[in-house]
Amino acid sequence: MIFTKKVKFHYYHEYNKNLFCITQMYNHIPGHGALTRKDLNVENVNNYIKRFSNKPHCFNNRTFFPRSYRLDNKTECDEFFIFINSQEYTKIKEKEAMPFITKVSYGSHRGHGLEILDAPHEKRLRRKFENGAMCGEIVDNIMAQRYISNPLLIDGHKFDFRIYMLVASTDPLIVYYHDGFLRLSLLKYDINSKEVEFFFKGET
């Protein structure tokens, strides 16, 4: 088995043509970033909505995905600062303590780089981007995303789960899978808790 951090490895090599020995496997699916990168997830959802917005029989409601803005994308960055300067945002903040979070768009996981967009953080972000005037000039891979304050819980705990599959053959199709496992947050979820940042991290 070969492990590589070179994302574009598969761009320059053809599989199953003497690249590996018969017993060797490659542990990445070409193009997997379209599924695993947060910024590309946003792009794919936006493209889906644009493509099917005029087809009522398709699922074109974006409520299944929280409102997201990639701040290294000028258009989305402009939209974000227009939004947080709007009356709508002011009203949302009056009802919700933490309407947004910011996170690293790619190259980070397990909650690293994730921050609540509270008043101090919002002030820093406005200063850094000069309240939107620097959109398109700053290319940090940061995105702002609406926080889901009423998540699905198990016995009051936030959770995630992992399921692993191995495609041993495509012709005939042979797939092995493990039943998976569930990870629960140590503390029960409480949006008003003093430990609120605890619930935003992926290692809880």
Residue ranges and their predicted role:
Residues 1-99, 106-109, 117-122:
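Conserved N-proximal alpha/beta basic substrate-recognition cap immediately N-terminal to
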Residues 72, 91-101, 105-204:
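Catalytic core of tubulin tyrosine ligase-like
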